[in-house]
């Protein structure tokens, strides 16, 4: 690991079923290396900080490197999501995405903000692929932010986005991707989100 990575854990112990588990996991991960720092904040008491990091639900983990890359995990990153979470910490620390050069160039062409939400479950073997791509896109481009959300912990979002299977990716509240897709297809959908809604609706 090259640079320090901060894991900002937002919790609300009294009303959040899995906040304690998420907080303990962040503590354990922060003990793996002196380059990983775990910080815990109360979603209500520290609401200004939560708003500053665009945290709107808990448990939430913001992963911060040299700067805030807009990468968030909502839930407890266990199961198949654990490896993708750890890989992302390493990528942030080393500022490495391992994306194809063509993908990097396409990300450089983005001119409008892109919000990627990847809905996952911990028992889904393909979800970590979609999550990993979203993480890396956000790390590569300042205009991309990525939320990975364990839909089993936020069932109201499952209803809102009509999630029947995972992974399901929602880009800018308009474009939906069902399943894990290759890097080239993923970036194509991201670029599509740059067009006016009338073009892709």
Q: What residue ranges belong to the model's regions?
A:
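N-terminal non-catalytic structural scaffold regions of very large proteins
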Residues: 21-77, 96, 110
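Phosphate-interacting basic helix/loop segments used at nucleotide- and nucleic-acid interfaces
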Residues: 102
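Short, hinge-like loop/turn segments at secondary-structure boundaries
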Residues: 56-57, 164-166
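Local sequence-structure signature of Cys/Sec-based thiol-disulfide redox active-site neighborhoods
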Residues: 1-33, 106-142
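Non-catalytic, surface beta->alpha helical segment in thiol-disulfide oxidoreductase systems
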Residues: 62-96, 165, 170-201
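Short, charged/polar "capping" segments at the starts of alpha-helices
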Residues: 15-19, 46-48, 126, 154-157
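Compositionally biased, intrinsically disordered or flexible polar/acidic segments
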Residues: 50, 129, 158-161, 169
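Thiol-based oxidoreductase modules, predominantly thioredoxin-like and allied folds used
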Residues: 34-46, 141-158
